[in-house]
């Protein structure tokens, strides 16, 4: 993309999944109007408000370098919210679009992460990044290769340029490794009303904006990844009494402990904590 930054296309919720997926392949991002019904959003907010208020600002783990000290990142929504489990996680259009993007190349998809993201007054702009960068495989993708993730950010408050609306570079998912680094003047803000959502590919450059107001900016983020990013065999059915006779390395190899990527990014967590800590998992010494 060159010259003036392109606007983000806004689409009605009656859009067909195939049309939406085609727009994502072309632009890397779309805004979906009326993604969440007002009553769903209100019930979700009521369930998480108290926990969000109790959540401290800043990163819970050192790998979360994109979470600054004026941002709240509250994960573990499966545990915290029945509305998220029942009405949001299984959003039909979101999953139908993901099927269009992933199924032919990968098969099923699953939840990568979910969190409430709240920018406090004075929160600085986030560094521009691609969500797929947490996966080493992203280094080997060409712009025309299958995508590695599909992110969704729902506005729970109004998103304005002044309060830190997410900024994105439409078309940047088509940039190869030789392309110059992205710059803020290439971005456009995702201006949204509560209940609207941005969907964007993991290969698209984006970042949270600066909150220059006295109000918070709250969003609900979640991302889907292909099922290829999981072991062929599950070991969750193995009795815990057996697992706790194993060494920490053996437990990690069968999926009972958090693992780390090439950038020490934690995968397979329990909310914002290491899985073994949440479980209180015992082990035998090596």
From Swiss-Prot:
Binding site for Fe cation: 129, 131, 206
Pathway(s) annotated for this protein in UniProt: Secondary metabolite biosynthesis; terpenoid biosynthesis
GO biological process: terpenoid biosynthetic process
Listed cofactors: Fe cation
E.C. number: 1.14.11.-
Consequence of gene disruption: Impairs the synthesis of both terretonin and terretonin C.
A matching Pfam family: PhyH
A GO term, aspect molecular function: dioxygenase activity
Keywords: Dioxygenase, Iron, Metal-binding, Oxidoreductase
Superkingdom of origin organism: Eukaryota
Cysteine-cysteine disulfides: none
Class of this enzyme: oxidoreductase
Role played: Dioxygenase; part of the gene cluster that mediates the biosynthesis of terretonin, a fungal meroterpenoid that acts as a mycotoxin. The first step of the pathway is the synthesis of 3,5-dimethylorsellinic acid (DMOA) by the polyketide synthase trt4. DMOA is then prenylated into farnesyl-DMOA by the polyprenyl transferase trt2. Methylation by the methyltransferase trt5 then leads to farnesyl-DMOA methyl ester which is further subject to epoxidation by the FAD-dependent monooxygenase trt8 to yield epoxyfarnesyl-DMOA methyl ester.
Subunit-level organization: Homodimer.
Family: Belongs to the PhyH family.
Record protein name field: Dioxygenase trt7
Organism for this UniProt entry: Aspergillus terreus (strain NIH 2624 / FGSC A1156)
């Amino acid at each position: 993309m060159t010259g003036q930054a392109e606007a983000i296309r806004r689409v009605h919720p009656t859009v067909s999944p195939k049309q939406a997926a085609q727009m994502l392949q072309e632009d890397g991002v779309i805004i979906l109007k009326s993604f969440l019904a007002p009553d769903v959003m209100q019930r979700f907010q009521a369930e998480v408000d108290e926990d969000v208020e109790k959540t401290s600002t800043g990163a819970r783990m050192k790998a979360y370098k994109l979470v600054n000290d004026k941002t709240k990142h509250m994960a573990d929504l499966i545990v915290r919210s029945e509305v998220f489990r029942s009405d949001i996680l299984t959003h039909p259009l979101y999953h139908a679009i993901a099927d269009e993007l992933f199924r032919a190349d990968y098969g099923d998809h699953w939840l990568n992460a979910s969190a409430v993201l709240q920018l406090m007054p004075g929160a600085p702009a986030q560094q521009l990044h691609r969500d797929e960068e947490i996966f080493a495989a992203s280094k080997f993708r060409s712009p025309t290769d299958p995508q590695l993730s599909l992110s969704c950010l729902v506005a729970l408050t109004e998103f304005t340029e002044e309060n830190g609306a997410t900024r994105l570079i439409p078309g940047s998912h088509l940039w190869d490794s030789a392309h110059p680094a992205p710059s803020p003047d290439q971005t456009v803000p995702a201006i949204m009303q509560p209940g609207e959502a941005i969907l964007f590919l993991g290969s698209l450059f984006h970042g949270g904006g600066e909150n220059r107001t006295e109000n918070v900016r709250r969003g609900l983020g979640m991302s889907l990844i292909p099922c290829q990013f999981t072991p062929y065999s599950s070991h969750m059915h193995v009795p815990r009494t057996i697992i706790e006779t194993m060494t920490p390395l053996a437990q990690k190899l069968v999926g009972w402990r958090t693992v780390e990527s090439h950038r020490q990014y934690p995968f397979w967590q329990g909310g914002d904590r290491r899985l073994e800590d949440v479980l209180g998992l015992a082990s035998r010494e090596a």
